[in-house]
Amino acid sequence: VKQIVIKTPEEIAKMRHSGALLAKVFAMLDEVIVEGISTMEINDRAEAFIVEELKSRPASKGQYDFPYVLNTSIDDVVCHGVPSASKILRSGMIVNVDITLENGGYIADSSKMYCIGQVTPLAKRLVNNVYESMWQGIRAVKPGATLGDIGHAVQRHAEQAGYSIVREYCGHGIGRDMHEEPAVLHYGQPGSGLVLQEGMVFTIEPMINQATAASSRRKTAGRW
């Protein structure tokens, strides 16, 4: 069984630095992700910026044989969508861009939702709710709280709005490795599960659906 790696204040400072660099990638992409761009161009622009401007490593590239630096998941694709030169963003689409970056030995992992052009009120409401649900989970984090407290906070906010939590995917510990312990579920019971302690670092990245929570997996080229 893998152990949870407790980070020192110095390690957390390095992780904050990696996170700040990743925020710069999204700030750059905010100007780039518009109607008419292909998801492969988003990938290529991000890779050039990470490597050339930030002198960092795209941590996803080569991980699990993944050949790209980010995932682009459009509309009903829950996560892990693959960039393509033929996938052009059109008005009305919602797209999640998920990027990892390593600097100084420590990895940052983040994603952002983009609404392309004019999206429907239903789509906008979904995007807003998943963001709010994520923050409900983040606000539950403190030493002495539990993973169940986080999951419950996310689940309650999403389900009160009529949405369902996707249960096949979860957050995770992060540090020198992209995926560390613990697994962070986005549903749960208050007071249940692992008790949080200072020095733990993990992601909270809920995925919610408008209707059923069910999702299916699709294979593309290679393992992706």
Model regions and ranges:
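Active-site neighborhoods and metal-handling regions in enzymes and metal-associated proteins
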Residues: 1-224
